[in-house]
């Protein structure tokens, strides 16, 4: 029983890692193309939200929970810091423009989703957990 659970968790961690790597590759491509293709603020926010929702789905599968309640007051960090950590690990330079987009997503999460059991809070915590 314990072995099965460990295998299941390992599979989901691998899937989460793949999603984060794919997201980083997409971010890298947008950095490469930023001089040629203009990404609007709305598109940037939608891209980040879609990536977060994919990760959220994997977290829900991983823990088999409908709602994960987390105390927001205990956690103080933002998505920009997290993405910068990913960039250092992946050796990617992230432009100021893209960091502004991510910061905007972070502000949306803080203002639009104030419930303690909000999925986006879970996503932010998951990001931090997998980067430490």
Curated annotation (Swiss-Prot):
Top-level division of the source organism's lineage: Eukaryota
Something else known: The two FS800 proteins are read from two overlapping reading frames.
Described function: FS800 is likely to have some function in the production or maintenance of the schistosome egg. It may have a function unrelated to eggshell formation.
Identification of the protein by name: Female-specific protein 800
């Amino acid at each position: 029983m314990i072995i099965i659970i460990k295998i299941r968790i390992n599979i989901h961690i691998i899937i989460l890692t793949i999603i984060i790597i794919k997201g980083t590759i997409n971010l890298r491509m947008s950095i490469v193309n930023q001089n040629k293709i203009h990404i609007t603020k709305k598109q940037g926010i939608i891209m980040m939200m879609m990536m977060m929702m994919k990760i959220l789905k994997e977290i829900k599968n991983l823990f088999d929970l409908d709602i994960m309640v987390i105390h927001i007051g205990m956690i103080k960090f933002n998505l920009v810091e997290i993405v910068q950590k990913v960039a250092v690990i992946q050796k990617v330079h992230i432009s100021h423009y893209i960091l502004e987009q991510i910061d905007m997503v972070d502000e949306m999460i803080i203002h639009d989703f104030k419930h303690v059991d909000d999925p986006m809070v879970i996503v932010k915590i998951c990001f931090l957990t997998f980067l430490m």
